[in-house]
């Protein structure tokens, strides 16, 4: 226990390190070992018994679900069939055996089946003679109950086709359903205090809407604490479709840190969002905005015009943004504050810049002044911003990557050398 709470917080530490008595620099994986201990104290060893009470079940990224489903050893159908086999009492087994025997007799006695078996026997006798030929019949094999149950296979389309004929996405969905049922059995078996279930890249071969449904299913498994078994689900993904429907405080971003040559984690769980921030982000983060979690850098702009023009300008300058891993994200307005909270040092800390209009306001301060003060106060606590004029605020914002034009987008484009092109578009669209 690292914090008695409430809520109480306990921590297990996994440390991968060079072997204690190595006596030299490690040269290969064989020179390393791992230790697991409680909290931050290496002396508080966590043994196998406790680890069995807190298992981590991982469903790896599905690459060939069809092959795994066809293999009795690997199939997630196996534990369900084995459970079925052990649940059958003597009377149920006898009833099934009688039904199988009747079906076997009907099949063996069918005239065409008998004729085919006789043809095979006659040819065998012709080749090897009656002394060496063995009696043959055609029938179902095996007929023992346990063997029959192991031969059960999942069928689709009302039994017309097997899993081998299903699409990759359908096979993956069936695989996940079976693994989920297997996990239910393990979790409710009273042999575990808590289970951590990791689902790796569930989006493989699935259409976007099904990706979202799969995610929402796993999200809902822990929604009702009264009826839900002790289970924590962790889902990893590269899908912006899933990211777009993820609760904004449920995101953990893993990135490579070049300076430390290590993987670092950043979470949105403690990001200082207001209720309005959460509502706005949850409402407006669609698939395109969901890309920001996978970007190396983000350019925040006001609207769709900038979202389309900025990549085109970058392409013309020989700097394709996709090649650089940079996403242009429209905030659909001028409220950049929730996005700066999301991307800033109190969140995943994704490098970002802002491109926004000055928006002159007659004799008053340009509207951009208050806009920039709001985001600058997130980056550094400084109450003196309110005493600065617009130009001073703009100058303070520039080192943070917050850039402002002289007016608004359209006049800037017009005087920036695009007047003729803009005129052509206007005339074409308005049929002038």
Language model region names:
Residues 68-71, 78-199, 225:
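Extended helical coiled-coil dimerization/tether regions that scaffold
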Residues 149, 153-288, 413:
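Switch/communication elements of ASCE P-loop NTPase nucleotide-binding domains
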Residues 37-46, 138-139, 236-238, 336-341:
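Short alpha-helical segments and helix-capping/turn motifs at coil-helix boundaries
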Residues 1-97, 101, 118, 369-391:
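Glycine-rich phosphate-binding loops of NTPases
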Residues 16, 60-63, 142, 156-158, ...:
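Flexible glycine-/small-residue-rich
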Residues 57, 195-199, 299:
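Hydrophobic positions in the central parallel beta-sheet of the AAA+
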């Amino acid at each position: 226990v690292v914090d008695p709470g409430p809520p109480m917080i306990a921590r297990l530490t996994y440390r991968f390190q060079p072997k204690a008595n190595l006596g030299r620099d490690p040269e290969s994986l064989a020179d390393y070992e791992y230790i697991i201990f409680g909290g931050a104290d290496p002396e508080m060893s966590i043994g196998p018994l406790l680890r069995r009470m807190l298992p981590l079940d991982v469903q790896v990224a599905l690459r060939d679900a069809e092959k795994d489903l066809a293999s009795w050893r690997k199939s997630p159908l196996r534990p369900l069939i084995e459970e079925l086999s052990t649940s059958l009492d003597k009377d149920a087994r006898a009833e099934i055996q009688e039904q199988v025997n009747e079906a076997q007799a009907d099949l063996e006695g069918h005239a065409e089946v008998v004729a085919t078996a006789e043809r095979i026997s006659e040819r065998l006798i012709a080749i090897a003679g009656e002394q060496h030929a063995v009696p043959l019949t055609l029938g179902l094999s095996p007929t023992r109950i346990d063997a029959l149950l192991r031969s059960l296979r999942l069928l689709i389309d009302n039994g017309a086709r097997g899993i081998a004929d299903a699409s990759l996405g359908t096979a993956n969905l069936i695989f996940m359903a079976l693994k989920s049922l297997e996990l239910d059995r393990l979790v409710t078996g009273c042999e575990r205090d808590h289970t951590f279930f990791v689902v790796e890249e569930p989006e493989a071969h699935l259409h976007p809407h099904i990706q979202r449904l799969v995610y929402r299913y796993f999200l809902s498994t822990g929604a009702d604490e009264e009826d839900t078994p002790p289970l924590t689900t962790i889902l990893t993904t590269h899908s912006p479709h899933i990211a777009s429907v993820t609760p904004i405080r449920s995101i953990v971003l893993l990135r490579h840190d070049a300076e430390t040559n290590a993987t670092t984690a950043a979470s949105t769980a403690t990001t200082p969002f207001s209720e309005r921030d959460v509502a706005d982000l949850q409402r407006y983060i669609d698939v395109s905005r969901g890309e920001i979690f996978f970007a190396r850098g983000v350019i925040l702009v006001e609207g769709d015009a900038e979202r389309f023009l900025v990549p085109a300008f970058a392409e013309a300058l020989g700097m394709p943004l996709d090649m650089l891993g940079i996403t242009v994200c429209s905030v659909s307005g001028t409220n950049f504050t929730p996005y700066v909270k999301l991307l800033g040092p109190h969140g995943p800390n994704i490098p970002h810049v802002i491109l926004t209009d000055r928006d002159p306001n007659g004799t008053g301060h340009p509207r951009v002044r208050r806009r920039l003060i709001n985001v600058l106060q997130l980056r550094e606590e400084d109450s003196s911003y309110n005493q600065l004029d617009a130009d001073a605020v703009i100058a303070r914002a520039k080192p943070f990557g917050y850039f402002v034009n002289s007016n608004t987008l359209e006049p800037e484009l017009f005087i920036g050398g695009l007047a003729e092109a803009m005129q052509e578009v206007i005339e074409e669209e308005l049929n002038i």
